[in-house]
Amino acid sequence: MTDISTPKGLAVLGAGKMGGILLEAFLKHGLVAPAHVFATVRQTSSERRSISSAQITLGTDNRAAAKDADVILICVKPLAVSAVLDEIRPELNDQKLVISIAAAVSTEYMEKRSGGNVPVLRAMPNTPSMVGEGITAICKGKHATPQHLELARKLFDAVGKTVVVDEKHMDAVTGLSGSGPAFLYIILESLAEGGVKMGLSRELATLLAAQTMLGAAKVVLETGHHPALLKDTVTTPAGCTIDGILELEEGKLRVTLIKAVVKASQRAKELLFSDKEN
């Protein structure tokens, strides 16, 4: 892959939920021509409906998809990665870039399974990518270059923000931004339930909770101020907010959320596929 500013051919192996989201975004932003996209699914008839472009090549043969691609995006479950790498290994070389979004599969493991000096990257996108508000953490293996990282950043920027991290932090990323949307949905649902308890319709309560969460997050991102400082700007002496915060503190919300991220991160570490695995 001499020119790696944009993929000449892209293989998406496992174009299911997240794979399909990424593929649609790449096509929408013109990052790859539909005629140069090769995607695999388990059942072409059922999955075709989730992919808008009929110009892509859709099938079930991973090796065939990887053959003419210079960027190969693996979007299968962690336990399926080894089988996929074994299948496409004859088509891999140092001119192709392999990117895996599978949690807990190390670059060392993928390099070993790929053979040779194949450039490998790990990526951890999250589900808000479906509306272009995701965040993806990427890290590179020993054969990947800064140019490979820039190509990956260009691709994943299509679904939100992209950050480069050391691989040792990928488990923490998984626990925070990977699992985080589920934690936030629970918080959002609970806020809405509070509104319902106080007489609001469920539709209005959900809208208020969702927009409030969105707006608060945007303030943090755009001002760069610490959340604690921003919290204090809402909290007036002897006001409503401080009474609500007291309830949150008594309910140990803060420590519970911290422990949720830690536990999810530890689980990712337990699942880790390293170069020591067969």
How does the language model describe each region?
Residues 1-60, 64-68, 133, 196-197:
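NAD(P)+-binding Rossmann beta1-loop-alpha1 motif at the extreme N-terminus of oxidoreductases
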Residues 2-6, 210-278:
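NAD(P)-dependent Rossmann-like dehydrogenase/reductase catalytic/cofactor-binding core
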Residues 33-36, 94-96, 119, 203:
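Short acidic capping loops at alpha-helix termini that bridge into adjacent secondary structure
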Residues 37, 65, 81, 201-208, ...:
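Small-residue helix-packing motif on alpha-helices
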Residues 109-119, 135-172, 185-222, 267:
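Internal alpha-helical scaffold of NAD(P)-dependent oxidoreductase catalytic cores
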Residues 121, 170-175, 227-232:
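Short pre-catalytic strand/loop immediately N-terminal to key active-site residues, enriched for Gly-Thr
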